[in-house]
Amino acid sequence: MEDKALLTEAYQLVSKLNQTIQSCKQGLPDDLRLQQNIDEILRALKKAEKVDNAILIELETFYQRTSLLIGLGTLKLNEQTRTAWRNYDKFHYDQVKHVLTLYGPVFGF
């Protein structure tokens, strides 16, 4: 996938998630954390000019934090929001995970 296309698709998917999440906010601390995660990654994607390891790490950080909030948090998501998250999840595994380069010691089990 072309650099700009990856950034554009990530931005569109996170924006869609952001739009759908607005309808099911309840004012809980997890809602605030999720909104902060979304705002951070949207800023980073808007600022990014090319795909490099820095933006891939930002995307991975967003994915890990958001996945934890959705999986174990107190968020009450509707079906539309779950679908938007699954779409981003699929994109992340198909386009980001295999491109991300890890440096330093990596321990596999």
Regions found by a protein language model. Name each.
Residues 1-40, 100-109:
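Short terminal alpha-helical segments
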Residues 5, 9-10, 44, 48, ...:
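A sequence-composition feature that detects small, non-aromatic residues
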Residues 7-8, 14, 46, 57-60, ...:
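Compositionally biased amphipathic helical and low-complexity segments enriched in hydrophobic
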Residues 11, 15-18, 35, 39, ...:
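Generic detector of well-ordered alpha-helical segments enriched in charged/polar residues
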Residues 21-72:
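Amphipathic alpha-helical interaction modules
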Residues 64-109:
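Amphipathic alpha-helical binding modules
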